[in-house]
């Protein structure tokens, strides 16, 4: 599966009614429209540090997505009829660290829970997918092999994104995927096992940028509450 960050939704404008309306009815319409707009807006995209952890949240502003940082390495996100978003907490820079995480992940539709990060030189977007909804994100990639790590087999895939948004602007870059065959929400992710397996397949990483345990959703609804440590 390729990342959907290059997709953006265009909003349609509603024409005003030509006939006059009662003031009370007009007032109700305006308040309702403003309320629905606020719901659609959700949380704006942002990055930074929170309680000692780096966080990143990106949305294409489709549907409703509410992301909230919590204590320590915790965050929560609720989404409804969303476009595409990805957000979570972790570290900057990333490394071949051992990551522990716990929480809940309840998607309805296409979403996944994943270790997510970027490197530069080469520019690579990578995923170590722990859980997913109705769509296996490896289906859109090229199968390269598998690796056993932390109690399960992970299938390895690559995909190429052309002129797509990245941490360096719109670029062409490669995605690396490890997708866990037995889904879970919580446990240990030994990232070095994946990085080493990728390297043996000729999938080189560069200089690490940020690395988070992320929730990503595409045209779906759901909720997620995750703590990394």
Curated annotation (Swiss-Prot):
| EC number annotated for this UniProt entry | 3.2.1.8
Spell out the InterPro entries in the cross-references: ConA-like_dom_sf (IPR013320), GH11/12 (IPR013319), GH11_AS_1 (IPR018208), GH11_AS_2 (IPR033119), GH11_dom (IPR033123), Glyco_hydro_11 (IPR001137)
| Pfam families to which the protein is assigned, alphabetical | Glyco_hydro_11 (PF00457)
The family line of this record is: Belongs to the glycosyl hydrolase 11 (cellulase G) family.
Q: Where in the cell is it found?
A: Secreted
Q: Which gene encodes it?
A: xlnA
Q: In which pathway does it act?
A: Glycan degradation; xylan degradation
Which key words tag this protein in UniProt?
A: Carbohydrate metabolism, Glycoprotein, Glycosidase, Hydrolase, Polysaccharide degradation, Secreted, Signal, Xylan degradation
Query: Could you give a single Gene Ontology term from the biological process aspect?
Result: xylan catabolic process
Q: Where is the active site?
A: 125, 216
Provide a GO CC annotation, any one.
Answer: extracellular region
Positions of the GH11 domain: 41-229
A single Gene Ontology MF term assigned here is: endo-1,4-beta-xylanase activity
Does the keyword section mention Repressor?
Answer: no
Query: Protein name, please?
Result: Probable endo-1,4-beta-xylanase A
């Amino acid at each position: 599966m390729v990342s959907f960050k290059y997709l953006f939704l265009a909003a349609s404008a509603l024409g005003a009614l030509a006939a006059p309306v009662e003031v009370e009815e007009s007032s109700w319409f305006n308040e309702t429209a403003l309320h629905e707009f606020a719901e659609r807006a959700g949380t704006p995209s942002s990055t930074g540090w929170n309680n000692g952890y780096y966080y990143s949240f990106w949305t294409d502003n489709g549907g409703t997505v509410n992301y909230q940082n919590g204590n320590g390495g915790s965050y929560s996100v609720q989404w409804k009829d969303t476009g595409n978003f990805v957000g979570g907490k972790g570290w900057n820079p990333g490394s071949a660290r051992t990551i522990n995480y716990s929480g809940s992940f309840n998607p309805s539709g296409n979403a996944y829970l994943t270790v997510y990060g970027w490197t530069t030189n080469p520019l690579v977007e990578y995923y170590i997918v722990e859980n997913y909804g109705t769509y296996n994100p490896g289906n859109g990639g090229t199968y390269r092999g598998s690796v056993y790590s932390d109690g399960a087999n992970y299938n390895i895939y690559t995909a190429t994104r052309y002129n797509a948004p990245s941490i360096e602007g719109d670029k062409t870059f490669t995605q690396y995927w490890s997708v866990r065959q037995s889904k879970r929400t919580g446990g240990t992710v030994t990232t070095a096992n994946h990085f080493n397996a990728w390297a043996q397949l000729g999938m080189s990483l560069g200089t690490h940028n940020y690395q988070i345990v992320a929730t990503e959703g595409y045209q779906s609804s759901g909720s997620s509450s995750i703590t990394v440590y």
